[in-house]
Amino acid sequence: IEISDIKEKLNYSNPHETSYIYTVFDQIFYGAELYEEIYDIPSKFLESGLIEKDKVLIDSEIISSLKNKFDEKLAVVTGRGKFAFSYSLKKFLNKFDLVNSVFLEDESKDLAKPNVEPLLKSIRGLNSKHCLYIGDSMEDMLMANKATDMGFKTTFCGIFGTSKKPEIKLEMFKENNVPIILESITQLPKALNLV
């Protein structure tokens, strides 16, 4: 057995069909039923997926406030694929501009965060003059800053309460002069004076 063969099989950045880790992860994440629905092959695991434990942090009030403030221009740039996003947020799916949203799991790996191109695609598609980009990672912050540096005015709102170590995330956002820092996205309407 060649080490290079093993490394190739374990490489997460390979396509789903050739990456053992990618395949196992998706089976655990989606569960047996959804995995078969997506890939048209049975899962080796029979349990329900971790996706069933997703906690949706937005609600109708938040979405309504944002849609009113931003003239219906509400899109997402997410590391998830469209299927996972749609499954978890099915209750709110029709509230987003999915045409101008980017689902990075479905895109080439070189477009992964913090590559700014997916964000710029969304900003251009929405014809946005000033974008509010909400995220909970350093990569999100870097994307927003890069978009602004490139002439696409973007205000980053950093959410720190979703982190395993929120105090460290809060400090990182403060050290980088993030203009809006919130513990939870539920605080957003109040922070933007929308309520």
Q: Which residues are covered by each model-predicted region?
A:
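Acidic, Mg2+-coordinating phosphoryl-transfer loop and its flanking beta/alpha structural elements
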Residues: Y133-I180
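Short acidic-hydrophobic, aromatic-tinged amphipathic segments that line or gate anion-handling sites
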Residues: P179-L188
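Substrate-recognition "cap/lid" segment bordering the active-site pocket of phosphatases
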Residues: E47, I51-V56, A75-L132, M138-D149
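Short amphipathic alpha-helix with an adjacent loop that forms part of the alpha/beta core around
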Residues: L188-V195
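Alpha-helix termini
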Residues: E2, I6-S13, L66-N68, L93-N94, ...
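Short, acidic/turn-prone active-site loops that include or flank metal/cofactor-
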Residues: V102-D110, I159-K165, T186-Q187
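Catalytic-core regions built around general acid/base machinery
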Residues: D59-D71
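A metal-dependent, Asp-based hydrolase signature
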Residues: I1-K53
